[in-house]
């Protein structure tokens, strides 16, 4: 045991699902909306969810949220250096 407290951030009820898009998914997303990664909202590499996923700068994260009024919706963020 490392002596370090381990906490799985994704098991918390308030943290939505996160995943890293594959290169094919990333390309399809950017083409669909006719945008560049620089036009996406940013998320820092030091964000606990990004660290838990092992994402690196340039990766695009898909975040799946649930809403009682809107149902399920997705949004995307590009990982940037701190």
Curated annotation (Swiss-Prot):
One of its GO terms (cellular component) is cytoplasm. One of its GO terms (biological process) is transcription by RNA polymerase II. Pfam families: RNA_pol_Rpb5_C (PF01191). Its EC number is 2.7.7.6. Part of the RNA polymerase complex. PANTHER family: DNA-DIRECTED RNA POLYMERASES I, II, AND III SUBUNIT RPABC1 (PTHR10535:SF0). This is DNA-directed RNA polymerase subunit Rpo5. The lineage of its organism: Archaea, Methanobacteriati, Methanobacteriota, Thermococci, Thermococcales. The gene is rpo5.
């Amino acid at each position: 045991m490392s002596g370090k407290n381990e906490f799985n951030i994704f098991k918390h009820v308030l943290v939505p699902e996160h995943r890293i898009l594959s290169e094919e998914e990333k390309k399809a997303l950017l083409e669909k909306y006719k945008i560049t990664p620089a036009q996406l909202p940013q998320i820092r590499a030091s964000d606990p969810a990004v660290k838990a996923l092992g994402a690196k700068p340039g990766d695009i994260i898909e975040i799946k949220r649930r809403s009682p009024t809107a149902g399920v919706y997705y949004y995307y963020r590009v990982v940037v250096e701190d």
